Amino acid sequence: MWSVMGLVRRTAMSSTVNKASPVRSLLGGFRCLNVESKEEDEKKDMTVLEAKKLMRLVNVEDMKKKLIGMGDKEMVTYTTLIEASQGLGIARSLDEAHAFARVLDDAGVILIFRDKVYLHPHKVVDLIRKAVPLGLNPDDELIREEFDKMRSMKEEIDVLAHQQVRKILWGGLGYSVVQIGIFVRLTFWEFSWDVMEPITFFTTATGIIVGYAYFLMTSRDPTYQDFMKRLFLSRQRKLLKSHKFDAERFKELENKWKITSCSSSSCHANASIRNRVGVDLDLEDSLQSHHRD
């Protein structure tokens, strides 16, 4: 940093001397020299300020990376931030540490309030937004109406997809019960265990092979939860296509609405179906499935 400052000063001083010489020789007085030197000093000061600003911006970016280590904390004390900036070598003195803290606060990287430093300012803004409702402009009102309409339509599609998935799962349970009943009947009434043992063995081995094939195709563990999620997304994709639902437009409206007035999890479009199905679903899964069609 000091090498850059010294280079700027030397450049400005050399330009001052070079430009002051012809003024002295032509006018033969010191008044013009003083005026010229003043202008050059102002230019030099502006250049130094610009260099300081540039170096501060570089330190802000460096401090952003260093603060990732504190990312698991919501808030630290101001003293902790000052000690961290000095310990990381970003600030050489206490005054520089205070200056860097002000720069971080001005840049919106952190929020300094009294003796507390909030490392996630956007969360503080969300809390204030929920506590103090903001008025909507006409454009936001149109966005809200369109978003509510599409969200209601998507909730109906999700409920219908969930009902179809439940029917399929209950059908699978019925198939398993009937299969076991048939094996019991054949083992103890029609045939004997010597005859049914190979049949049950190969049936179980077939189930294991199917689970392994599922893992190879999906790169996921063959769990009932994952199978239910994929089955739900498959039914949801078909219903979205049949109802001509624009998932990309809905995602855009959801992002705008979350930014303008809604930040809680209950405002997300997948909150109701997540509570009903018990599976963590994301609209991006629906978009990716929709693009594969």
Curated annotation (Swiss-Prot):
Transit peptide feature range: 1-33
Subcellular location per the Swiss-Prot or TrEMBL entry: Mitochondrion inner membrane
Family designation: Belongs to the MCU (TC 1.A.77) family.
Predominant location: mitochondrion
Protein name: Calcium uniporter protein 2, mitochondrial
Origin superkingdom: Eukaryota
Membrane topology: Multi-pass membrane protein
Gene Ontology biological-process entries: calcium import into the mitochondrion; mitochondrial calcium ion homeostasis
Binding site for Ca(2+): E197
GO molecular function: calcium channel activity; metal ion binding
Gene Ontology CC: mitochondrial inner membrane
Residue spans crossing the bilayer: 168-188, 198-218
Assigned keywords, A-Z: Calcium, Calcium channel, Calcium transport, Ion channel, Ion transport, Membrane, Metal-binding, Mitochondrion, Mitochondrion inner membrane, Transit peptide, Transmembrane, Transmembrane helix, Transport
Catalytic activity from the UniProt record: Ca(2+)(in) = Ca(2+)(out)
Motif mapping: Selectivity filter: 193-201
Function statement: Mitochondrial inner membrane calcium uniporter that mediates calcium uptake into mitochondria. Constitutes a pore-forming and calcium-conducting subunit. Mitochondrial calcium homeostasis plays key roles in cellular physiology and regulates cell bioenergetics, cytoplasmic calcium signals and activation of cell death pathways.
